């Protein structure tokens, strides 16, 4: 009798490591999507035990690694072997049981750019919030944050300062990844503006870089919550003689300006809240002022990317928000008495310039 534990045939690939048949594609789905929770928990172990750091200064035997992290050798070997298969680490084929870093694992070391993302997205709090994902789809509304003792995602920061720091560091990673594309865009010119306000700008990295590139901008303002701007890690705050950091709440008021930028802000909020945010900004906009929105624009005609759909579910579960198509963005702007002036095509993350009607 089959115990249910027998091993099905795993994906077969050709010489180029390409999955070739429907069966192989289905089995690959098992190894990625269906078993995703296992990947997440395994990666959580690697992050907690700083294994990427341990291998940074050279190859280590399994005994050296296990002694360092306080894990028995058999378990440690199976953990590292798992991630050799996922190309995070490599094993010396001439000396089995000796492991070394890869260029990928370096990115997740303490000095690596992706370390904050690796820690945050496998964090116990993050994992706990996603246990109720089936209920979210059944109800059309997420109560995920209640499982971690808060009514709204943003309240987590007061209760869990370490998670808040990880969030801020993760936002810095996203901003760094987008900066070169934004600053090199031929479709945007900030030289025409006297004051530029980055709403929800975290620690001012984007607006700071714009001030470096555009000396004609007289004043840059980084506007975010007090808990973000005055976070425990002040080393993240960007410093520039023309940059001011102002704490506040964009549901209440924002600084007056002739240009606003918002990067991945509105996708954090349900439509009715997005309308409130835009109407708050509207009250402070100088004549002919513009808002540059850096947001994902889903285009069904081009097909759905894994990144866009992943972020959409992330927003759904954590903050009851979503990613939007261009038509959905236009509907939102209409509700807030704004108009879409243009889409900036050479911004990979998506960029829309809007103004008041």
Swiss-Prot record:
Catalysed reaction, written as an equation: (3,5-dichloro-2,4,6-trihydroxyphenyl)hexan-1-one + S-adenosyl-L-methionine = 1-(3,5-dichloro-2,6-dihydroxy-4-methoxyphenyl)hexan-1-one + S-adenosyl-L-homocysteine + H(+)
EC number: 2.1.1.-
PANTHER family: O-METHYLTRANSFERASE CICE, PUTATIVE (AFU_ORTHOLOGUE AFUA_4G14580)-RELATED
Record keyword Transmembrane helix present: no
Enzyme category, top tier: transferase
Family: Belongs to the class I-like SAM-binding methyltransferase superfamily. Cation-independent O-methyltransferase family. COMT subfamily.
Swiss-Prot/TrEMBL GO biological process terms: biosynthetic process; methylation
Residues at the catalytic site: 267 (proton acceptor)
Domain of life, source organism: Eukaryota
Encoding gene (name): omt9
UniProt keyword terms in alphabetical order: Methyltransferase, S-adenosyl-L-methionine, Transferase
Protein name per Swiss-Prot or TrEMBL: O-methyltransferase 9
Keyword NAD part of the UniProt annotation: no
InterPro entries from the UniProt entry: COMT-like, O_MeTrfase_dom, Plant_O-MeTrfase_dimerisation, SAM-dependent_MTases_sf, WH-like_DNA-bd_sf, WH_DNA-bd_sf
């Amino acid at each position: 009798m089959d115990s249910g534990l027998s091993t099905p045939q795993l994906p077969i690939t050709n010489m180029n490591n390409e999955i070739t048949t429907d069966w192989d594609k289905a089995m690959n789905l098992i190894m990625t999507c269906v078993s995703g929770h296992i990947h997440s928990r395994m990666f959580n172990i690697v992050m907690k035990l700083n294994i990427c750091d341990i291998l940074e200064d050279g190859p280590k035997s399994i005994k050296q690694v296990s002694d360092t992290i306080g894990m028995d050798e058999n378990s440690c070997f199976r953990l590292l072997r798992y991630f050799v298969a996922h190309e995070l680490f490599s094993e010396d084929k001439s000396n089995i049981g000796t492991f070394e870093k890869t260029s990928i694992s370096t990115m997740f070391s303490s000095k690596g750019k992706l370390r904050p993302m690796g820690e945050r997205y496998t964090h116990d709090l993050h994992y706990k919030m996603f246990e109720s994902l089936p209920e979210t789809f059944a109800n059309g509304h997420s109560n995920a944050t209640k499982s971690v003792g808060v009514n709204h995602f943003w309240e987590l920061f007061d209760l869990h300062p370490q998670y808040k720091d990880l969030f801020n560091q993760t936002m810095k990673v996203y901003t760094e990844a987008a900066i070169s594309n934004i600053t090199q865009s031929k479709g945007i010119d900030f030289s025409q503006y006297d004051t530029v306000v980055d709403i929800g700008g975290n620690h001012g990295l984007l607006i700071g870089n714009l001030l470096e590139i555009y000396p004609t901008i007289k004043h840059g303002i980084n506007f975010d919550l007090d808990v973000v701007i005055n976070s425990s890690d002040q080393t993240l705050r960007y410093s520039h003689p023309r940059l001011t950091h102002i704490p506040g709440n964009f549901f209440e008021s924002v600084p007056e300006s002739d240009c606003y930028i918002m990067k991945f802000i509105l996708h954090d909020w349900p439509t009715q809240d997005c309308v409130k945010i835009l109407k708050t900004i509207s009250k402070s906009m100088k004549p002919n002022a513009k808002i540059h929105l850096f947001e994902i624009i889903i285009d069904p005609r081009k097909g759905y990317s894994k990144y866009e759909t992943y972020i959409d579910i992330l927003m759904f579960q954590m903050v009851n928000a979503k990613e939007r198509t261009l038509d959905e963005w236009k509907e939102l702007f209409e509700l807030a008495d704004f108009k879409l002036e243009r889409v900036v095509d050479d911004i990979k993350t998506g960029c829309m310039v809007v103004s008041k009607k």
